């Protein structure tokens, strides 16, 4: 798969901040969007990988050859052109990092959709691997180490992902030798005004959950640290630690009460008691209630050599039978032989695998 040199916000004027550089890149890219009558002019459309409120993702084979790609479609009646271009440009700028899903050249527009291609992850997303129990400790460490590097790469370029969750982690092989963070639809320059989530989310940090409209907070990398901590918990347990990081949620209150009590009780509340002390220390740092003292993502690297206490999770070469590929998931149900670019998305459910959420 062709990879070009990354375009970073540092390119050009060294004094230009990330937000200004990104806006400049969006403006330059506007003229590079290719209008086509149909996506079939350039791709053989194989099957639907997922869908969401703003579009869908299709498995497609370029007519010009090369590997299959995940073709992301965003509905033009629901997504601003600038929103589409921003996601595409951010993706192109950070594609050099293996922990971030590669966005390919050549943005398109049809009468109904904006579209761009991304690399295809054969094993789907991380949420599909998490069934009744969490991953083996080795795989949990592989996942969070790769994501920590990806987030540090974003943060070093003045960007915050702002949507770290299992659904947005794409898996390339059953043992997680490579995973990549996708869905850059909510990625913004650090300092961008950020409101509370439109609906309660288990991955949102308490400082955002506490906001009331129309209040906002400047977007900070600490938001991604919190998301990484929640994702670590999910990968280890196959469930979220709470429905929302806000009182009166009982699970969050139990955790918050434990970490804020001085001196801290030696025994954490369930389900945190399943983690060994090094993993607890890592989780407490990433899930620090104060964003000013929250650990950066790369703190993960200091704990990789420690025992995390996850020996009870599935072990052995056959433990990931649930890590089915997109082909296995879609078998017999999502042929695109009859689909057209004017297809009706209103009946689609689920998520897109790389869907950007609200514009």
From Swiss-Prot:
Keywords: ATP-binding, Kinase, Nucleotide-binding, Serine/threonine-protein kinase, Transferase. It catalyses: L-seryl-[protein] + ATP = O-phospho-L-seryl-[protein] + ADP + H(+); L-threonyl-[protein] + ATP = O-phospho-L-threonyl-[protein] + ADP + H(+). ATP binds at residues 49-57, 72. Its EC number is 2.7.11.1. InterPro entries: Kinase-like_dom_sf, Prot_kinase_dom, Protein_kinase_ATP_BS, Ser/Thr_kinase_AS. Residues 43-309 form the Protein kinase domain. Residues 350-359 have a biased composition (Gly residues). The active site is at 163 (proton acceptor). Residues 314-359 are annotated as: Disordered. The keyword Cell division does not apply. GO terms for molecular function: ATP binding; protein serine kinase activity; protein serine/threonine kinase activity. It comes from the Eukaryota. This is Uncharacterized serine/threonine-protein kinase SBK3. The gene is SBK3.
């Amino acid at each position: 798969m062709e990879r070009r040199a990354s375009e970073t916000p540092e390119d050009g004027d060294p004094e230009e901040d990330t937000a200004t550089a990104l806006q400049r890149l969006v403006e330059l890219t506007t003229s590079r969007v290719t209008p086509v009558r149909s996506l079939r002019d350039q791709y053989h459309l194989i099957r639907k990988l997922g869908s969401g409120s703003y579009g869908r993702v299709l498995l497609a084979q370029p007519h010009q050859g090369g590997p299959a790609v995940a073709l992301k479609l965003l509905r033009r009646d629901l997504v601003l052109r600038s929103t589409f271009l921003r996601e595409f440009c951010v993706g192109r700028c950070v594609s050099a990092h293996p922990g971030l899903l590669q966005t390919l050249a050549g943005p398109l527009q049809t009468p109904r959709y904006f579209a761009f291609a991304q690399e295809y992850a054969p094993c789907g997303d991380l949420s599909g691997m998490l069934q009744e129990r969490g991953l083996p400790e080795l795989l949990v460490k592989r996942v969070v180490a790769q994501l920590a590097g990806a987030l540090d790469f974003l943060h070093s370029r003045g960007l915050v992902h702002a949507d770290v969750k299992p659904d947005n982690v794409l898996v390339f092989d059953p043992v997680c030798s490579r995973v990549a963070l996708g869905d850059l639809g909510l990625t913004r320059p650090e300092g961008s005004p950020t409101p509370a989530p439109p609906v309660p989310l288990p991955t949102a940090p308490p400082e955002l959950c506490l906001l009331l409209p129309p209040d906002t907070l400047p977007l900070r990398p600490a938001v991604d640290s919190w998301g990484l901590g929640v994702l670590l918990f999910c990968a280890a347990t196959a469930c979220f630690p709470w429905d929302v990081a806000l009182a009166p949620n009982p699970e969050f209150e139990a955790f918050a009460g434990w970490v804020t009590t001085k001196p801290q009780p030696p025994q954490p509340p369930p389900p945190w008691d399943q983690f060994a002390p090094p993993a607890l220390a890592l989780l407490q740092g990433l899930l620090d209630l104060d964003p000013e003292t929250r650990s950066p993502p790369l703190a993960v690297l200091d704990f990789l050599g420690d025992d995390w206490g996850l020996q009870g999770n599935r072990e052995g070469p056959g433990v990931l039978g649930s890590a089915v590929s997109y082909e296995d998931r879609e078998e017999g149900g999502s042929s695109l032989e009859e689909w057209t670019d004017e297809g009706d998305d209103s009946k689609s459910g689920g998520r897109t695998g790389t869907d950007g959420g609200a514009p």
